[in-house]
């Protein structure tokens, strides 16, 4: 990277942007935000970007649409100010709707991708994106980095009893395996079934996979926790089969509608997330993973 690097602190991710700038030893540029009475956002970039490589850090957690539009405003303005732009979206909203699951559904991620393509971004970086297919809608160079090793190192230092990494479903088995490799243990995936229309989650407590969890400390690992339905159900089942302790780890702790209290009430000993989404459980910093990818651009 020949250009001078600067980091723009998006309104949704100021602390994370500060951490990124420290690791890169880069100039930190503040972004002013004004919200009008009707909900519109106005963005003002307080710095000179001409000829610089600008890393814009802005997650799109709730309010999703406001944070998404603010990100697009920053990318567009930074480009017009003469910067080469890397849109860093630690939590990328709309990645779940990456195809038409039911007839008539809008493919939200397709439009989100096209908006960043046309806004002026040269690169896009996400962290543990919900769907790899989501990245295919970016026509610019898009990279997804994993926070799993950072989460795993947190738990590796906790001196757990015969730890076992557990994915709440088969779709996350690769994530659990990655986590287990860092911790130095094994992993399993729970046989979860979700009704596409009602969203109801079911896990068979008599499934043979669960035998491996008896008497051990288990770490439920997922990419995101929204309302926590899957994690709550998984925690209840793991407690029922006789685990020693149940810990919950996720990259994106959205924790909506009282999810954290519900998870703890289900029997979890601790919930740990990263700072892609600021929360009371955001104990792991993803800045090192982001900076590692930036250094490769």
Give residue ranges: language-model regions.
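PRPP-associated nucleotide enzymes
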Residues: 1-297
